[in-house]
Structure formats: structure tokens, C-alpha cells
Amino acid sequence: MKKTVIALSALLAFTGAVAAPNWTDWDTFKSVSMESGRVIDPSDSRLITTSEGESYALFFALVAGDKAAFESILAWTENNLAEGDLTKHQPAWLWGRRTADEGALWTILDTNNAADSDMWIAYALLEAGRLWNRPDYVTKAHAMMALLKKDVRTVKNLGDVLLPGRVGFENQGSVKLNPSYAPLFILKRFAAEDPAWESVWAGSLRMLLRSAPDGFSPDWVTFDREGRIVDRADEDSAVGSYNAIRTYLWAAMTAEDTPTFASLAERFTPMVKAARRLGRPPEKVNLNTLAMNHAGNAGFAGCVLELARRTPGETATADRLRTAVASHDVTRESYYTNVLALFARALDEKRFRIDAEGRLHLPLETR
């Protein structure tokens, strides 16, 4: 009985943290960035849609309890990026309008997949299936996970890792990885469905920690066949910027009372301190010299907000970052900043939380 009361109290506390079930940010995002289930990024003249944008929108629709939008996003993604069947085809990562010289057709522009987007789609399907009692979503998620497993590679002294895409990330035994493509809570959730993913979770944790020895995650990192980091000679590997910033957000979405979060929080403390010094996280960090350029935008602030909130002695830093991300207006022209801000503000407003097994928990009002 006592355990029941405690559990109920925790649930009520979580539920009560949200002032209202309506999520204005999501409604605005839909109105300015979505058409018929398609998320549009107008920063590219081809008016592109990426599997990333679709995957994030699925998660936001789930958090908002917006079943109609979820179904619309899923249908557009499946029909336009996955040849009509996500159980058989990984979604192409890039869709848009070809140039006039190429006929100005609306079509897939790059057939390669983006593994992180596939993971987010499968995760959203798993959790929508569980929370909304939709076994068809779970079946689809399992099929996507099976396709992803084909791109898992075992790296000596590192472990199992997931390639960022089917093509272009292997070279004579070395693998090029993107730390922001490895949200550990998603891999933990996959492992509950298929134990084979447990080793990918473990290898990905090692990759995240080893790729950031000074506390700053790189946009990309290459490991040789012995599991050693290849010299950071190229610009991608020598910089932590627009890709890497998500790594801190995913780390802070990990359940707080876990050894995994403790390891990540300790490793990424230098980024929190950098955000304190600059007022916001740096837009770019040179990982060879640790030189930093100017402070990043509101989306960058949002990515480090929760990590700062959980870091002892950084309450003032978290408050400044909260103010920064709150200042962002969701507009059509700012796709990437929009999605980072939506993740950060929803997390800070306790519209969702993720437990130690990677399960998504939502306040009752938003289901």
C-alpha cells in the first residue's frame, strides 16, 4: 500500500507540473512548418524534407497526444521516403524539389538513410504502440529495428556500434560515427524488445565517452579497426557544432538516477561550464585546441539547459539558458532551432520524461 501511495504521489507530481495539456509550441510548429504530414525546411532552396524532421515531428505529436498528426506524419514518411512500406525499406533521408535543369520534380534527392532518424521513428512507433494500444505500430517498429541491425558493426576494443547510414561510413575497417546519432535511451528501449541491442547500447556509451575526452562531443569521429580514434585532421572530426550539440540534449534526457547519466553528466561538465562563461553554449568548439567561437543560438541553449539544471552549482546557468530558449519564436525560417527548442522546452516543462529502461512517460492530460 505504501509503495502504491508513493508511486501515485510521484505520478501526480509529474502530472501537476504541466499547467495545461495544450502545447502551443507544437501547434505553432504545425502551422508554420508542416503541410499534410510533411515537415518543410525552407533554408534550402529545394524546400527539403528530411527523415530527421519527420522523426522529430512524430515524437512531438506523441508527446502532444496528437494522434491525427502522428498518423499524417507517418503516412507521408512511409509513402514518400520508404517506397510505401517502412517494414521493408529504410526511409531516404532527403526529399525535395530538383532544380529547374533537372526538371523541378518533387522527389527523393538522396536514397541513403539516416540511422538516427530511423531510430527515432522506430522509437516513436514503439511508444505510440504501447501508450495508445496500437500493436500495428509496434510491429512496424520491430521491422525497422531489424533493418537497422544490418548496419551494426563490431569494432575491436569498442564494441557494437550502428553506422550512421547504409553507405559511406566504412573504409578499410574504420568506421565514421556521429555521436549525436546515438541516443542511449532509444537503444535501451530497443534492447527491451530485442536483447541484441544491449551490446549496441554498451558500445555506443563507450563511443560517446571516448569521443569526448575533454568534455566536448565532436560532430563526427572515426575509429580504426583496433578501436582507436583516428587523428582529428579533417574539419568534421575536429569540430563540435551543429551535429554535436544534440549529444548533450540526448544525454540529459537519460533517466537521472542511473549510472549512465552520471557518466555522461560528468564527462560533459566542461560544456556546461563553457555555457556559463559565454552565456550560451559555444556554436563551435575546435576539439584540437578547445578554442571556441561565439555563443550559439537559442536552440544550442536549449540543448544544454537540462544538463545544466541537473549539474550541482549550475542553477544560475540553467536559468540563463532557460531565458535564452524561451526567447525563441517558432517561425517557418528556423527549422533546426525550432526542433531543438521544442525538445528543450517540452523537457523543461515536464511534458515528458524517460525512465531507466527508455520508456516514455507522459502526463495523463496529454495522452
Pin down the residues of each PLM region.
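C-terminal functional modules
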Residues: V285, T289-R367
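Solenoid-repeat scaffolds in large eukaryotic assemblies
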Residues: A57, A69-F70, R134-A141, F261-L264, ...
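Extended ligand-binding clefts on enzyme/binding-domain cores
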Residues: P21-T24, L47-S51, K88-A92, A115-D116, ...
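N-terminal signal peptide c-region/cleavage motif recognized by signal peptidases
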Residues: F14-G16
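Aromatic-rich carbohydrate-recognition surfaces in CAZymes
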Residues: T50-A57, T107-G129
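Short glycine/serine- and small hydrophobic-enriched flexible loop segments
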Residues: L58-G65, W120-R130, F185-R189, L249-M253, ...
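Positively charged n-region of N-terminal signal peptides that target proteins for export
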Residues: M1-T4
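Low-complexity, Ser/Thr/Pro/Gly-enriched N-terminal "stalk/linker" regions
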Residues: V18-E52, L62-I108, K156-V161, P195, ...
